[in-house]
Amino acid sequence: MPVQMNQDIKAAPSNASANTPVKKRVFSGIQPTGNLHLGNYLGALRNWAQTQAEYDNIFCIVDLHALTMPIAPQELRQATRSLAALYLACGLDTRYCNLFIQSHVHEHPEMSWILSCYTPMGWLNRMTQFKTKAGENPDTVSTGLYCYPVLMACDILLYQTNYVPVGDDQRQHIEFTRDIAQRFNSLYGQQVFTIPEGQIRTVGARIMALDDPTKKMSKSDPNPGSRINLLDDPKTIKQKIAHATTDSQRLVAFDPERPGITNLLTIYQALTGQSEQEIESEFASQGYGDLKAALTERLVTTLAPIQQRHKELLSDLPTLDAVLKQGADNVRPIAAATLQHVKDVIGLG
């Protein structure tokens, strides 16, 4: 099934009639590193696919951010295309969104340099994610890792973004972006940047690790058994669910004091749409093995069409690249207009 090229999306809403409300703009970026997992799908991708017609959506594969940690060139290229295919396979539709690669729009690094000149060092020193990734060797990591919150802010502000879908653990980055925008606007006494708001995910946002249900499922977790990747085959899914942490009790019920079984039930609930009461009733006379078997079957059924579509998209790279090029062509005028406005305001050119 070929990818449908979007001929309807415009780079700016200037052609809207006076009676046509302009849609709010949503921006989201994700690095082409690691594997997209079930938490990404239930907490973000599925919801984006369901609500994409309501917004002016810009989805960016932030390959420049991926350079902050060591990665082989061919691995980066392959991961970028695979991620693009997975986005589309999960239901993103180019009639309602633009999907592009960050490095294909040169305004990103140029704006990042400008904004870095307006960002106090103290703001960057407070960013907890750098401290986490740098670990005990902060002097050996790249400057890019230290400064990447500025590039992230630039990604958002370039497109005059209204909303940024984020998890609760990314609140700090949104506040950082808002601080930069407000500081710049205040300094020059005009509304150069739209002040973005974070859309904090709720449904499916707290999918926890299978091996340690006290922490979130993460693509950066060194233990592959901690997560269900969207491209895991049925055998792998079965093994991971079979080894998922539970407890010594037998009652299948939602209980915050029993995070392991509650995590599996939460995943089952997100996949089936059933209420807690309906699920507990379904498994009232059954045990953990029955729940794990039912959950495995539901996961395999849910992910099979996504995996098939992903395979089809990667089998036709010219068409996939054309979609990414079109996305970049559509959004570049927005980024260029914002960058030019900034240059005019600060006296460049």
Task: Enumerate the language-model features and the residues they cover.
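A broad, structure-centric signal for solvent-exposed, well-ordered loop/edge residues
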Residues: 33, 74, 99, 106, ...
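Short, histidine-centered active-site or binding-site loop motifs used for metal coordination
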Residues: 30-32, 63-65, 162-163, 221, ...
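Structured ligand/cofactor/substrate-binding pocket environments in proteins
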Residues: 36-44, 49, 58, 62, ...
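N-terminal Rossmann-like or analogous alpha/beta NTP/dinucleotide-binding catalytic cores
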Residues: 2-154, 311
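Pocket-edge structural micro-motifs
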Residues: 28-30, 101, 160, 211, ...
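Conserved nucleotide- and phosphate/pyrophosphate-binding catalytic cores
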Residues: 172, 178-349
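Short helix-capping/linker segments at secondary-structure and domain boundaries
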Residues: 121-125, 158-165, 269-279
